[in-house]
């Protein structure tokens, strides 16, 4: 709630109950990226970080990841603010700042509960960041989120929080930046020819123009007169292999990390959105809205 000169401005965050059952297979991952993500979340220790703005589906992806690896033999504990969905078989802790139960206090207690996997809703400060690193380097798997624009800047953000480069490089397994883009209503769509200006704006591959059939949504009551129905995720993944770890140890800048990750197979968010455009899932307007040029 925000008081303004014309009265109270209220924003409601609605959580759909249907999202509880989402699995990794229906979160928009291309097959190759899904294979990479599954590989790293199955490791016995290290950190998996998902970054993006508020409302980019980070928590949904983390819940799906936990459900993927969950078993009776794995002790999974989460620290969240708030607990968005209750997951059977997982120990979920709700933050209560008013009684002193913040992220760092909760984590100090959880370390004595012998968890195998820890989910930290968000790394917000230096103490939380260092506890996460310490936990991941003592034989535990840590999942968390960070507010950052893309995967390379996530590394910079974690360094800014005070994590020493040698510890960050040693503890990271994978970083994934994520965005949500709206999908065209499959029952109300039509063929569309974008202008040369639109294609140049998103740097659409020239060799793909003739072979791509573009679509736009038709506004209808069933899609709330938007032409869109539902959303899908796009992902930008950095696998923190030996070469990437060395770049972090050397305090390489963001551009150097970006170029190295791209050479190692990272698909930037803009390119990931264009892939959805090529297969007719979304529109040029959504690519422009959700991503920026590399």
Task: Describe every region a protein language model picked out.
Residues 1-294:
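Short, flexible helix-loop junctions that flank or precede catalytic/ligand sites
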């Amino acid at each position: 709630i925000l008081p303004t000169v014309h009265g109270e401005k209220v924003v409601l965050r609605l959580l759909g109950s249907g999202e509880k059952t989402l699995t990794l297979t229906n979160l928009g991952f291309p097959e190759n990226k899904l294979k990479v993500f599954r590989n790293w979340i199955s490791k016995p220790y290290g950190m998996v970080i998902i970054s993006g703005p508020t409302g980019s589906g980070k928590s949904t992806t983390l819940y799906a990841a936990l459900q993927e690896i969950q078993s009776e033999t794995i002790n999974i504990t989460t620290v969240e603010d708030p607990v968005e969905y209750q997951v059977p078989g997982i120990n979920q802790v709700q933050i209560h700042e008013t009684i002193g139960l913040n992220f760092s206090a909760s984590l100090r207690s959880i370390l004595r509960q012998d968890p195998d996997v820890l989910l930290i809703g968000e790394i917000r400060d230096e103490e939380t960041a260092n506890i996460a690193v310490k936990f991941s380097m003592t034989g535990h798997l840590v999942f968390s989120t960070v507010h950052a624009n893309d995967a390379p800047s996530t590394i910079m953000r974690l360094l800014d929080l005070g994590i020493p480069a040698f510890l960050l490089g040693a503890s990271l397994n994978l970083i994934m930046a994520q965005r949500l883009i709206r999908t065209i209503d499959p029952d109300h769509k039509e063929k569309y020819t974008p202008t040369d200006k639109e294609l140049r704006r998103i740097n659409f591959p020239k060799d793909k123009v003739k072979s791509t059939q573009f679509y736009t949504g038709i506004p209808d009551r069933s899609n709330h007169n938007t032409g869109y129905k539902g959303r899908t995720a796009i992902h930008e993944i950095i696998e923190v292999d030996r070469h990437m770890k060395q770049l972090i140890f050397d305090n390489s800048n963001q551009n150097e990390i970006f170029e190295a990750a791209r050479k190692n197979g990272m698909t930037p968010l803009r390119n990931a959105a264009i892939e959805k455009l090529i297969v007719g899932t979304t529109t040029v307007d959504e690519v422009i809205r959700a991503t920026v040029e590399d």
